[in-house]
Swiss-Prot record:
This is 4-amino-4-deoxychorismate mutase. It catalyses: 4-amino-4-deoxychorismate = 4-amino-4-deoxyprephenate. Pathway: Antibiotic biosynthesis. InterPro entries: Chorismate_II_sf, Chorismate_mutase-related, CM_dom_sf, CM_II_prokaryot, Isochorismate_pyruvate-lyase.
Length: 103
């Protein structure tokens, strides 16, 4: 195999992993929508600081256990959590408006 072919094969493998990563992020957001609906129906506050800490701590432990940069994974989860909170807030606001409209 030529060096160029090897590079193309490696990039194709990376592209496949990127597809899996993006699909996983989409699935995580979809699950966040379901969680937001549950929270809205059961009066659970959107922000759960204990849960946020647990998720970030788990990312840091994973990084340490697998030789990855802890700050990178914690920062990555900061971005993911920020987006999840934004989505949950939107969903819960809509759920609240829908409930008020039914009265």
């Amino acid at each position: 195999m030529t060096e160029q072919n090897e590079l193309q094969r490696l990039r194709a493998e990376l592209d496949a992993l990127d597809g899996t990563l993006l699909d996983t992020v989409r699935r995580r957001i979809d699950l966040g929508v379901r969680i937001a609906r549950y929270k809205s129906r059961h009066g659970v506050p959107m922000m759960q600081p204990g849960r946020v800490s647990l998720v970030k701590d788990r990312a840091a432990r994973y990084a340490a256990d697998h030789g990855l940069d802890e700050s990178f994974l914690v920062n990555l989860y900061d971005v993911i959590i920020t987006e999840m909170c934004r989505v949950e807030d939107l969903v819960m606001s809509r759920e609240s408006l829908t409930a008020e409209d039914r009265r």
